[in-house]
């Protein structure tokens, strides 16, 4: 397996799909990386030579991905909580943050139902 940014990339997949295995790289960003490096989207990872892999590694290293991105996201949420903003309070209470209703939905965010004690 080829390693890019500390992640094992599947060998038998197309390069665009394989790059999506890295946290922080989606379809659009994977295509941009391929365009910048001049690699065909339909090329498979096992058919890339070492120079092409190095080009991709260099492009990926310029981005904020994996642990850095996760750390930044948690720090952003922690900052909102520390400031005492409405969004921070919603994060703290494990409720939807972006204005969704909570009377009937929001089970994913709230977690499983808690039984009412009689």
Curated annotation (Swiss-Prot):
User: Where are the annotated segments for Disordered?
Assistant: 92-118
Keyword Zinc carried by entry: no
Which taxonomic lineage is given here?
Bacteria, Pseudomonadati, Pseudomonadota, Gammaproteobacteria, Enterobacterales
Spell out the PROSITE patterns in the cross-references. Answer: RIBOSOMAL_S13_1, RIBOSOMAL_S13_2
Stated name of the protein? Small ribosomal subunit protein uS13
Q: Which GO cellular component term is one of those annotated?
A: cytosol
Q: How does it assemble?
A: Part of the 30S ribosomal subunit. Forms a loose heterodimer with protein S19. Forms two bridges to the 50S subunit in the 70S ribosome.
Q: Which Pfam families does the record match to this protein? A: Ribosomal_S13 (PF00416)
Picking any one GO molecular function of the record gives:
rRNA binding
- Per the record, the domain of life is Bacteria
The record's Gene3D superfamilies line, in alphabetical order, gives: 1.10.8.50, 30s ribosomal protein s13, domain 2 (4.10.910.10)
Q: Which species?
A: Wigglesworthia glossinidia brevipalpis
